[in-house]
Amino acid sequence: AWVQRRLQMGDRYGMHLHLFHDYVESAGVTLRKEPNWGDNGTGYGVPLAAYTKDEQVRLIQYGLDLLFANGVPKTTLFRAGGWYANLDTLAALEELGFTADSSARTKYTFGRNKLPGYWDISPTMKPYYPSRTNQNRENPANEFPVLEIPDNGADSYAYSAADMIKRFTLNLGDGILTEPQQVTYLSHPHWFDDKEQARVRELFTYIARYNNADDHGPVVYSKTNVIADQWSN
């Protein structure tokens, strides 16, 4: 009911998937426990990309079916748990009719096992359609029809306010913007403690200096689905 109320108010949602063991088994997919970035045996740390393309289709479709069965309409937005999306993930999203993904980020390792990810984009990367052979690059002649909206502003759990402000200033540049740019920040509400809230307040206090609504600069706050519509082919 809460989700439905938010949708009625104009909010949109995207699917964010972690592969807990009971979820994978309920989806009818053979369970995998490796690779794992480090969890307590629940499957939370097993990346979606550990599974084949066809398995990923089944896992994602199962989640869509569960949502629909509980009165939540299908979404066309996605972000992989731990950002672990690969070319098979993008192919699965294409097959299932997703229009945008927000898993792309700068190069990283994650978790106590320091599992490397598949992304290696610039912090100033704009939304793009990934190449079918290199998800970190564009290739208009051979691209996925799934718009990649990079998580280029970093996340408030692992990064300091100064780090996130630096990402903003890199994307803002030194002069007048001559074309659109976007910066996406990520937070995890279930561990959004006082320290993290303070980092976010510091970040957005800084960004507010450039608010377009106050005639101070180019900053307009938006939602992922709006960005997807504005940047789509």
What are these regions (language model features)?
Residues 1-86, 144-145, 153, 180, ...:
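Metal-dependent polysaccharide deacetylase catalytic core of the NodB/CE4 family, i.e.
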Residues 2-5, 62-69, 134-135, 167-174, ...:
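A generic secondary-structure signal
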Residues 16, 103, 152, 222-227:
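Conserved beta-strand termini and adjacent loop/short-helix elements that scaffold enzyme active sites
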Residues 21-26, 84-89, 108-112, 157-158, ...:
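Short catalytic/ligand-binding loop motif for oxyanion handling, primarily in non-cytosolic enzymes
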Residues 48-62, 160-167, 195, 199:
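Soluble or luminal CAZymes and related metallo-dependent hydrolases
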Residues 77-180:
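Active-site-adjacent pocket scaffolds in enzyme catalytic domains
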Residues 100, 163-233:
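C-terminal domain-boundary segment and adjacent tail
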